[in-house]
Amino acid sequence: MKPSVILYKALPDDLLQRLQEHFTVHQVANLSPQTVEQNAAIFAEAEGLLGSNENVDAALLEKMPKLRATSTISVGYDNFDVDALTARKILLMHTPTVLTETVADTLMALVLSTARRVVEVAERVKAGEWTASIGPDWYGTDVHHKTLGIVGMGRIGMALAQRAHFGFNMPILYNARRHHKEAEERFNARYCDLDTLLQESDFVCLILPLTDETHHLFGAEQFAKMKSSAIFINAGRGPVVDENALIAALQKGEIHAAGLDVFEQEPLSVDSPLLSMANVVAVPHIGSATYETRYGMAACAVDNLIDALQGKVEKNCVNPHVAD
């Protein structure tokens, strides 16, 4: 008899078929308490869980006594109670490598669109404001040869540094938990403390996961240390930034502009002051949102769940020690 798994995110037909070759698959719309209650027997028997954008906490795990592995279609896993999973010896799988290049593309797009005011001036053209040769009120700022500060030199940070160094001749500063020898050798990147990075960078790109340590890591104090001409980019996790402090910094002119793919609350409220600022490019968490990459992430997540329930945790496992 095939193991039972719960799928709470739609998959392309071929990937669903692959999952069904290995498991009895039960599809649900979400992991809300109502859904769990209505499908209590299915949740009680499930050995695997696959999906994204839902919280997996201790309360849910209490309803799933046979769960052995959960696989998220994402690199981030801050919506999972890792301690609760680990305590129950439940494997957590994620997709850390598939989306690296695509997210780095998104970061570079935010750098370019904020610096050159692409969204703002495009809207002005559509509004009929381009009636003569443009003047300084349409100008942006250069990207090439400007200093890029990267906070979080992981896979995505490295991919961004590659684009910035080779494509735009940008000096690279970085701050991370440890020195990154490859970044320093390949991109001539310079490690520095966070204060130095904030003070010297023309673009500050935040690429950090959300943890207890990183929550509101960026607040009023950090924005006050940045150049008034600096542009802030966030494509990590929204709550790493105190959004009210960011809004205040933009309103006071402490920083020049912001390009944001993530927010403290998602979807972003239509009442957010960020949406009324011409110098803010706000996009709806599109970091990995291309057809190719989202398919690759889903395929990786399917393979991860198959591997996990077969006891293979050599890659893409957050807590492999629980399999010992």
Swiss-Prot record:
Keyword Cell division: no
EC number: 1.1.1.79, 1.1.1.81
Assembly and binders: Homodimer.
Species for this entry: Escherichia coli (strain ATCC 8739 / DSM 1576 / NBRC 3972 / NCIMB 8545 / WDCM 00012 / Crooks)
PROSITE patterns according to UniProt: D_2_HYDROXYACID_DH_2, D_2_HYDROXYACID_DH_3
Pfam families: 2-Hacid_dh (PF00389), 2-Hacid_dh_C (PF02826)
Stated name of the protein: Glyoxylate/hydroxypyruvate reductase B
One GO term describing the cellular component: cytosol
Residues annotated as catalytic: R237, E266, H285
Localization terms from the record: Cytoplasm
Catalytic activity: glycolate + NADP(+) = glyoxylate + NADPH + H(+); (R)-glycerate + NAD(+) = 3-hydroxypyruvate + NADH + H(+); (R)-glycerate + NADP(+) = 3-hydroxypyruvate + NADPH + H(+)
Stored HAMAP family: 2_Hacid_dh_C_GhrB (MF_01667)
Keywords recorded for this protein, A-Z: Cytoplasm, NAD, NADP, Oxidoreductase
SUPFAM superfamilies referenced in this protein's UniProt entry, alphabetically: Formate/glycerate dehydrogenase catalytic domain-like, NAD(P)-binding Rossmann-fold domains
Family stated for the protein in its record: Belongs to the D-isomer specific 2-hydroxyacid dehydrogenase family. GhrB subfamily.
Encoding gene, per UniProt annotation: ghrB
Chief site of localization: cytoplasm
Gene Ontology terms, MF aspect: glyoxylate reductase (NADPH) activity; hydroxypyruvate reductase (NADH) activity; hydroxypyruvate reductase (NADPH) activity; NAD binding
Function as written in the Swiss-Prot or TrEMBL entry: Catalyzes the NADPH-dependent reduction of glyoxylate and hydroxypyruvate into glycolate and glycerate, respectively.
